[in-house]
Regions:
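Domain-level signature for proteins that mediate thiol-based redox and metal-cofactor handling
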Residues: 1-175
Length: 175
């Protein structure tokens, strides 16, 4: 266990700890990269050796099965660093958006072989056709791609194939 001294604990300390907690479905991304950390509050020690920590998170979508694992991962990382008094709070509104992902996280997705979300978030309008969305292949960078299935390896991804290099790949859906 890595104990923190009460006098040098800052929110930055907690952010650094949280940056070590990975998304169980995409292990190259931390919960910080994903943008699901909404807030961090330090609570006074009140007779304890270290202050308490409250971490607010927003699921990538309602009912995301990874959220229990993520909450447990956050809790365990905090405990490992001596923050035994911790609370994980779920905030549903406003809903998470791919706009909250870090640029570093998007680059990590691409390096991992998953096309990162486009910069535009939200559902397409009724007039917008799926074929108009140009998704770049994370292998060869071609935009000559086609969607194979609306659903990929997880609910937040679609399955695409590159027409140039012929490689299939997941695309992280915008929302």
């Amino acid at each position: 266990m890595i104990m923190q001294k009460p006098d040098n604990i800052t929110k930055a300390t907690i952010w650094n700890i949280l940056d070590t907690v990975v998304d169980p479905e995409i292990p190259v991304l931390s919960v910080v990269d994903m943008g699901i950390i909404r807030d961090i509050q330090l609570m006074p020690g009140e007779g304890h050796d270290t202050p308490g920590v409250e971490v607010s998170i927003t699921p990538t979508y309602t009912g995301c099965p990874a959220m229990d694992v993520i909450s447990t991962g956050i809790r365990l990382a905090l405990i490992e660093h001596g923050f035994t008094r911790n609370t994980i709070k779920t905030i549903l509104a406003p809903a998470w958006t791919t706009d909250w992902m870090t640029e570093s996280g998007k680059q990590k997705l691409k390096a991992y072989g998953i096309a990162p979300p486009q910069t535009k978030s939200g559902a397409p309008s009724l007039n917008e056709k799926d074929s108009e969305v140009k998704v770049q292949c994370p292998q060869c960078n071609s935009f000559n791609t086609k969607r194979i299935s609306q659903f990929g390896s997880t609910a937040c991804k679609s399955l695409y194939q590159c027409e140039d290099c012929k490689e299939p790949f997941d695309y992280f859906k915008c929302h």
